[in-house]
């Protein structure tokens, strides 16, 4: 790597370091219940809905206007010429479709956020909040503001209206110009919230007219020196946006790409002046990784305590009390639980519990004794311990509570356990839920009962960490609790590393998608080599699709091919002896052509294949037929030094007139 490449890669790493810093700041604000979300059109794209540009595409075609023009003006021109109903029909028809699963919205709904704002007309956010067991109040016009109901877990402000009432949707230039007159309460409330809360803006492009309006509001509202810090996910200007339908980029579009990149840099600097920090992403899909990072950073300090004893015999802690020890009127088990609650809070962990009999009350006592709460105990129930009692609840309700609590935790400590039977014990249910969530599990064997049995189950499968094994040799309660705290701290360090690594590895995940079609038995080694060369280089603009696991079911294989080719613009065809006769290669070529992909055929000219001029001529003829007469330039893997030139071949395929 030359010095210019090193400088460029260092710059990319610096951007990610800054992104991580912003995400960590957001996490701290979430812990204080200080974050609201503002969702733009990009959020709903993954649900199968179109963005603003594509929503108005039919109108642009009808009016013979450039789709890259001012979209709200275009909507106004249509209304002036044809009336409003056509616009209403577009909104109603587009959002009548059933949405696809949307991972970004799922993570947003999981986050501990109570207020969501959006300029979108669809119901993607409210539906996902309901899936996450969060009741949501929808405010789609300012008249509904007077009906605020505190029983709801979330509020969604739909500033531009709702798909069910397209007549009232904000869409045209006139709608924007009269917004403050017709919907003044929305504007005033948002202005207050921009001062009171930290906002996370998501789904906006750098030239989004809605972002322009919010910036204008921020500039007029946030004129003090100490601005509230806000954050905005923004997709980098990408070269893929400037390819034509043949996947070729002209010199004019290269010039536009350079100008837009500069404009985006200036926009980011301008936003920073008004307290809005930009989290730059390569692709909206990369936001998924960052939202997951936010959620896991929020939950990393959350510990679920699972355990209880027989409510009819609240003095029976089994063999744990065989060692006689009393202090302040507490037996050994009660001392242990109290000390555990105290030290967890002292070390910055938050406790979640179903308040099991003989366990929850002593954990709470420990929280009250924590040094953190020495001045006041007013807010500790909300901030340091989250209790949802299972006592008296029916079984279905119990399981729902357990799942909700455990999903919000990164670790689980299992102590005692009323029943040794898996069928009867809620402890086993909580243990299984924790396994499904991928939680770090600490069964304290010394406490006996279900905790000991779960320890033995995990130990049998070598799933007990060294930190947890060391608890068995603890001599006293202080040592045992210190060991638990240290195990949690080590888990936190390891999780932090994994989360950071995932973010850094995502830098090179997005670019112009490349699909490799080949005969697996003959050419999988070369296909793997190409994938590694292209994906390893963070500086190129390509990403090769990887098949993580070999599939056998023909329906599954074809479905995977369909899904992956949709994400790509280039198909590399590796040609060896029987490649063009293979069923799946033919299918992949067919789908690639239908998707408009550029085809790059590469002949694997090894001694084993022994391609003479006659064979090459036959291959070219077959390929010509499969590509419906379209001419392509054949490359030779060995003769043309493919290892060195593969990225050059990809670059050449984008140049105007190359194909």
Annotated model-derived regions:
Residues 1-110, 114-117, 121-134, 208:
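Gly/serine-rich nucleotide phosphate-binding loop at the start of the catalytic core
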Residues 2-37, 62, 103, 108, ...:
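SIR2/sirtuin-family catalytic core signature
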Residues 28, 179-193, 362-364, 368, ...:
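TIR-domain catalytic/interaction hotspot
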Residues 37-42, 120, 177-240, 351-355, ...:
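Glycine-rich anion-binding loop/nest that anchors nucleotide
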Residues 238-253, 261-262, 359-365, 446-463, ...:
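Glycine-rich, charge-decorated loop segments at or immediately adjacent to ligand/cofactor-binding or catalytic sites
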Residues 279-295, 465-515, 520-529, 607-659:
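C-terminal interaction surface of TIR/SEFIR-family domains
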Residues 307-496, 536, 545-550, 560:
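Acidic/glycine-enriched connector segments
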Residues 419-433, 577-597, 609-611:
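Conserved TIR/SEFIR loop-to-helix hotspot centered on a Trp-containing motif
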């Amino acid at each position: 790597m030359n010095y210019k490449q090193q400088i460029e890669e260092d710059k990319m790493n610096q951007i990610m370091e800054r992104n991580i810093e912003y995400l960590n700041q957001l996490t701290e604000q979430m812990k204080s219940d200080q974050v609201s979300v503002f969702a733009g059109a990009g959020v709903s794209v993954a649900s199968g809905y179109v963005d603003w540009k594509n929503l108005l595409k039919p109108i642009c075609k009808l009016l013979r206007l450039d789709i890259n023009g001012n979209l709200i003006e275009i909507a106004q021109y249509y209304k002036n010429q044809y009336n409003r109903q056509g616009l209403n029909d577009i909104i109603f028809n587009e959002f009548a479709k059933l949405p696809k699963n949307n991972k970004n919205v799922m993570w947003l709904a999981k986050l501990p956020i109570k207020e969501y704002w959006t300029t979108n007309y669809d119901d993607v956010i409210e539906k996902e909040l309901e899936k996450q067991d969060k009741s949501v109040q929808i405010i789609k016009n300012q008249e509904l503001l007077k009906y605020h109901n505190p029983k709801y877990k979330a509020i969604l402000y739909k500033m531009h209206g709702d798909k069910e009432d397209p007549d009232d949707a904000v869409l045209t230039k006139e709608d924007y110009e009269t917004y403050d007159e017709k919907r003044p309460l929305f504007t005033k409330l948002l202005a207050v919230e921009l001062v009171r809360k930290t906002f996370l803006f998501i789904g906006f492009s750098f030239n989004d007219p809605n972002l322009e309006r919010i910036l204008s509001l921020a500039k007029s509202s946030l004129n003090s020196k100490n601005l509230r810090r806000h954050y905005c996910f923004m997709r980098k200007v990408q070269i893929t946006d400037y390819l034509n339908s043949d996947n070729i980029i002209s010199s004019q579009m290269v010039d536009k790409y350079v100008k837009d990149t500069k404009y985006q840099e200036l926009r980011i600097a301008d936003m920073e002046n008004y307290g809005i920090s930009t989290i730059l992403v390569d692709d909206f899909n990369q936001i998924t990784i960052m939202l997951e990072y936010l959620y896991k950073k929020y939950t990393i300090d959350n510990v679920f305590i699972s355990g209880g004893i027989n409510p009819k015999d609240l003095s029976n802690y089994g063999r744990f009390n065989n060692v006689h020890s009393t202090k302040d009127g507490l037996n050994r088990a009660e001392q242990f639980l109290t000390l555990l609650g105290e030290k967890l809070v002292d070390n910055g962990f938050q406790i979640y519990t179903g308040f099991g009999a003989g366990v929850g009350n002593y954990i709470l006592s420990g929280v009250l004794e924590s040094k953190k709460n020495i001045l006041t105990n007013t807010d500790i129930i909300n901030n340091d311990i989250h209790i949802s009692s299972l006592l008296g609840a029916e079984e279905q309700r119990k399981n729902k509570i357990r799942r909700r609590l455990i999903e919000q935790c990164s670790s689980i400590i299992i102590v005692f356990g009323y029943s040794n039977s898996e069928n009867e014990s809620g402890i086993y249910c909580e243990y299984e839920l924790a396994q499904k969530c991928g939680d770090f599990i600490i069964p304290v064997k010394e406490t006996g009962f279900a905790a000991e049995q779960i320890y033995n189950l995990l130990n049998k499968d070598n799933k007990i960490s060294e930190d947890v094994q060391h608890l068995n040799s603890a001599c006293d309660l202080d040592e045992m609790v210190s060991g638990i705290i240290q195990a949690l701290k080590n888990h936190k360090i390891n999780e932090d590393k994994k989360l950071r690594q995932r973010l850094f590895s995502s830098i090179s995940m997005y670019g112009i998608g490349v699909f490799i079609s080949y005969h697996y038995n003959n050419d999988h080694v070369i296909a793997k080599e190409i994938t590694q060369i292209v994906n390893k280089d963070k500086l190129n603009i390509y990403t090769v699709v990887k098949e993580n696991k070999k599939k056998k079911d023909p329906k599954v294989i074809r479905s995977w091919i369909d899904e992956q080719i949709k994400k790509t613009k280039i198909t590399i065809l590796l040609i060896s002896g029987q490649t063009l006769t293979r069923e799946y290669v033919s299918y992949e070529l067919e789908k690639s052509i239908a998707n408009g992909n550029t085809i790059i055929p590469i002949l694997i000219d090894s001694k084993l294949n022994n391609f003479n001029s006659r064979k090459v001529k036959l291959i070219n003829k077959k390929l010509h037929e499969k590509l419906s007469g379209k001419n392509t330039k054949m490359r030779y893997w060995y003769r043309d030094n493919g290892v060195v030139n593969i990225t050059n071949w990809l670059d050449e395929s984008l140049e105007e007139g190359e194909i």
